[in-house]
């Protein structure tokens, strides 16, 4: 019972072979230290560093910032973006916007011009039933109705 079991030697041999294969794979992955000198660091980036076209870094930054500033100023001029400076200007702008809103609201309630006045040359018989009659049309219709009644008598 306490002796060796049959076939356990092969198991040990197989385990040893597998362990050897793993160690061989790990050994190939180890990095060997290099004897070459370390790579030199790039020079530090300063404002006098030449970037491109023989222009220094501060030239490029200045030109780019002027370009962006000119675009912002142009857009503000086109869309009339102005920051008011005083309380009086702020209140005046508020009142102006309020008056403009009231004007547009009242303008929407006004009926179209063709409903308010008679258009010369318009055929009155083709008039829509839903449209609003003007005073002149009502008077003319009343006169025609009275004339027909007198003609029938």
Swiss-Prot record:
Which keywords does UniProt give here?
Deafness, Membrane, Signal, Transmembrane, Transmembrane helix
What does the UniProt entry say about where the protein is found? Membrane
What does the tissue specificity note say? Expressed in brain, kidney, liver, lung and cochlea.
One GO CC annotation: plasma membrane
Give the main localization category: membrane
Which top-rank group of organisms is this from?
Answer: Eukaryota
Spans within the Extracellular topological domain: 29-58
Q: Which residues form the signal peptide?
A: 1-28
Pfam families to which the protein is assigned, alphabetical: TMIE
Q: What is the membrane topology here? A: Single-pass type I membrane protein
Side Cytoplasmic, residues: 80-153
Q: Does the keyword rRNA processing apply?
A: no
Q: Which PANTHER family match?
A: TRANSMEMBRANE INNER EAR EXPRESSED PROTEIN
Oligomer and partners: Forms the MET channel composed of TMC (TMC1 or TMC2), TMIE, TOMT, CIB (CIB2 or CIB3), LHPL5 and PCDH15.
Q: Which function does this protein serve?
A: Auxiliary subunit of the mechanotransducer (MET) non-specific cation channel complex located at the tips of stereocilia of cochlear hair cells and that mediates sensory transduction in the auditory system. The MET complex is composed of two dimeric pore-forming ion-conducting transmembrane TMC (TMC1 or TMC2) subunits, and aided by several auxiliary proteins including LHFPL5, TMIE, CIB2/3 and TOMT, and the tip-link PCDH15. May contribute to the formation of the pore.
**Protein name per UniProt:** Transmembrane inner ear expressed protein
């Amino acid at each position: 019972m306490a002796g060796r079991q049959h076939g356990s030697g092969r198991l040990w041999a197989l385990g040893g072979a597998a362990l050897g294969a793993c160690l061989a794979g790990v050994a190939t992955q180890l990095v060997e230290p290099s004897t070459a000198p370390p790579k030199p660091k790039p020079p530090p980036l300063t404002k006098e560093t030449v970037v491109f076209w023989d222009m220094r870094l501060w030239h490029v930054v200045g030109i780019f910032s002027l370009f962006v500033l000119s675009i912002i100023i142009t857009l503000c001029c086109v869309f009339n973006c102005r920051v008011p400076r005083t309380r009086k200007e702020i209140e005046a702008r508020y009142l102006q916007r309020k008056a403009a809103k009231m004007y547009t609201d009242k303008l929407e309630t006004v009926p179209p011009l063709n409903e308010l006045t008679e258009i010369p040359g318009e055929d009155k018989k083709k008039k829509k039933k839903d449209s609003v009659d003007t005073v002149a049309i009502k008077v003319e219709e009343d006169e025609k109705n009275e004339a027909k009644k007198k003609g029938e008598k």
